[in-house]
Amino acid sequence: MIMDNFDSPFLYNRPEITVDSLKKSIVYKLIFSIGRSPKEASQRDWLNATLYAVRDFVTEGWITTARQSRSEETRRVYYLSMEFLIGRTLSNAMLAEGVYDVAKQALSELNVNLEDVLEKEVDPGLGNGGLGRLAACFMDSIATLALPGVGYGIRYEYGMFKQEIEDGHQVEKPDAWLDKGAAWEFIRPSKRHTVRFGGGIHFEGKKCIWTSKEEVEALAYDQMIPGYANDSAATLRLWSAYAGDRFDLADFNKGDYFAAVQDRTLSKNISRVLYPDDSTWSGRELRLRQEYFLVSASLQDIIYRHKRIHNTMENFADKVAIHLNDTHPALAIPELMVILIDQEGYEWKKAWDITRRVFSYTCHTLMSEALETWPVEMMAHILPRHLQMIFEINDYFLEYVRTYVSTDAEFIRRVSLIEEGDHRKVRMGWLSVVGSNKVNGVAAIHSELMVTSTFADFARIYPERFTNVTNGITPRRWIGVANPELSALFDRYIGKEWRRDLSQLTLLKDKVQDPELKKSIAQIKYNNKVKLANYIKNELGVEVDPNALFDVQVKRIHEYKRQILNVLHIIARYNAMLENPEKDWVPRVFILAGKAASAYYAAKQTINLINDVANIINHDERLQGRLKVVFIPNYSVSLAELIIPAADISEQISLAGTEASGTSNMKFALNGALTIGTLDGANVEILDNVGQDHIFIFGNTVEQVESLRRHGYRPFDYYQNDEELRKVVDQIISGRFSPTDANRYHQLLQSLQYHDYYQAFADFRSYVDMQQNVDAKYQDQNAWIDSTLQNIVNMSYFSSDRTILEYAEKIWKIKPVK
């Protein structure tokens, strides 16, 4: 074989997709890359050998894609995100390359079970929640659509944390995901960039000079993201922090060994963990350093790539699109300005014109308190030149506002990039809007509320800047990998093209009354529930009945996501079952999972309460096993792949107007779970697609939520007036579920009784009543399977391929390279 993508040809042997060839390749990698003989190899050795062998199939297409993206005519997007929750790589790569069955047979002939090997792969600790998983789905779609795009993130050494549950409490342990090696990645020793911090600035005439105090080296590691069946792959470049050559030999020779390596250790802290505890000033400082580290290394890399191809910055905005996934990378805006002015010698207005044409920004929240702000004092200490640039951008922007929009002092105060007060702050959401050419929301209702509430003032200034691109998920991961039986069913009924074109699911609409299809769907769901039930028994020691309704809420633990509302209903159901033991109750298993931020007390209390309630309910023999509660620790992509296909009910119960979109709602529905949810985020569009008979909508609307707030929401009134709610709350407060510590949940419940910012009490009655409708439908299994099928066949809109094509056309202005 000749690699013809270079000026002169190089001969090499391309791996063949045959059992014999792959078997030889795996053994070769085992011996010569890992240094193990087949007789001595552990399952993890076989995993890494298989990863190396499968990686060979992807690499050629990856190199070819990168070369085509470097064409002078190509415009390329660079996707900056603090998180990429990519999940396990081997199973996804084997399916993308069409070698899953071949690999399974090859390993079998080597007396190795592929499923056992796959279980040894750890999830990369590169993200936490929906933000990171969305970024991963997007990279998968960019690769499958052969779009010229590169992802940039941080290679966290210990992820966020490994969650363990001890006596019901969340305990955070290091997530040492790199300890066993990362066979899928390529280290790039030549791709190093220096990131500067601290020091001070001074002016020489009009020129601002930044004299930094500290330097950190960013070293690149590349992950390949394979496209599905297209011999293409995208690059995810992750930065790891090093101190470079800052080893103090003088200190070492004097015997001060700790001082000799102190700077190196401090530098590496930048890429140690995702989202360090921000309850302290030093923790906040580290977060700010992380964000700038990502931005600085990535922009240096982008500019280096661009200059290598074009040898000029004049066409930078024509050839480069940089996308900010939330506000975390917003420092890229002043960073590019600093580079263009201080290093490239551009005039301020020209630099600003280039900058605004380059950037676009996705807003992932409706809550203004969730939009990042940084203390001016902190930024002055860590990034003095960038703070000065933000002041300059703000002056320029406010002058524009005064000239063309309004001179009203209150309006000017609201839109200023600097929040005034005793402690001045930089508003990163505001900076992202002002410095971008497009700003998008991630669901129809979110985008509408974004321009009428969160960014209403900016929508007045830049009405053409705001748009909507509803989120999506990759069917290759969330059906292909997660639900192989459902994949096989789709293949049998509509062919295999649905993996690249999810609209093919509409072909099933004519078959939804087919008795064989209904029977198969029910059997697949049952089989997935058995798998999950076995996991729960083996890992947690809790026996659950796969014939019961599996009611699932798995997501980051946060007050706005309202896991507490779920718990209130569980206790209410428990009480009702004890009061009416003869009633024909639908057996239910409530399954919850998710991590709470280490400094988020209320969220950690909620996890504790879930586990305390589970402990009481699961040991109450009066229930005869008809009600179980399970909290599954350390939620991850691989656990999601196990849990989601097994769900009957998907809990999407955030307060209306707080969830930007959500994507777990899409994953559950595509796998045949019915949604119980509020009119929030993408739930609204799921309702539009599946129809009101196939989803359970409850709770106040956005307008009703706002009306309650305006007129003075009094949660204690709901507590007093609803006997069922009052009993539940009183039980928790009295220590019914925490007999060893009766006061454990006083603070949590008093916060609900007297504040309840996310209005759990207001929606309680509607929620509990709707759960009765869930029971009624589940008792009619024919109607339930009808609704399951209607959810599946109407989910094609929620493919991340559709989402990315919209980004490519509306925002990034890029085209496929193949």
From Swiss-Prot:
GO CC annotation terms, alphabetical: cytoplasm
Disulfide bond positions: none
Pfam family, one: Phosphorylase
Known catalytic reactions: [(1->4)-alpha-D-glucosyl](n) + phosphate = [(1->4)-alpha-D-glucosyl](n-1) + alpha-D-glucose 1-phosphate
Modification N6-(pyridoxal phosphate)lysine occurs at: 667
Enzyme Commission no: 2.4.1.1
GO molecular function: glycogen phosphorylase activity; pyridoxal phosphate binding
Keyword Isomerase: no
Biological process annotations from GO: glycogen catabolic process
Enzyme class: transferase
Keywords noted in UniProt: Allosteric enzyme, Carbohydrate metabolism, Glycogen metabolism, Glycosyltransferase, Pyridoxal phosphate, Transferase
Named cofactor requirement(s): pyridoxal 5'-phosphate
Task of the protein: Phosphorylase is an important allosteric enzyme in carbohydrate metabolism. Enzymes from different sources differ in their regulatory mechanisms and in their natural substrates. However, all known phosphorylases share catalytic and structural properties.
Family of this protein: Belongs to the glycogen phosphorylase family.
Family annotation (NCBIfam families): P_ylase
Protein name: Glycogen phosphorylase
Lineage: Bacteria, Pseudomonadati, Pseudomonadota, Gammaproteobacteria, Pasteurellales
Gene: glgP
